[in-house]
Amino acid sequence: MQAVEFSKGDYTALLIPGMGANLIRLTNTRLGAEILRAPADDEVETFKGRPHVFGLPILFPPNRIEDGRYTFGGRTYRFPITNAKEHHYHHGILKSQPFAVSKAWETGEEVLVECRYYSNAGNDAIFRDFPHEFKCKITDRKSVV
């Protein structure tokens, strides 16, 4: 898994673009304090299967969708059941999709990393369940403040 580590001031961050651009670690290096729940070395497989329980995942659409389907604007959307016990789709179509780092730069006071994901008819992983072309862009920034 490709990881992007970046630091500014007292903070170091670790971003995994290939798993939903999840910022899985944020550490205050001066205090030695972990800010986010990051996967331990023995939890890598858990992270791959359940990325929404670590870091700052993108959870679009959020929450749970009962029976894996809903209707909006006269159109019914169907998602795979991801929680069999409660029979619903759970937390988002982007959480494990491969984002690409589109830009990384530093200003005097900030370090920024921008990741993008494009969904279109050629991307069966999402388009099958959510047949809309869209672009998701997320920028993580760490500043001195």
Model-derived segments and spans:
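Surface-exposed acidic/polar loop and edge beta-strand patches at domain peripheries
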Residues: 1-139
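Conserved small/polar residues in nucleotide/adenosyl-binding loops
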Residues: 144-145
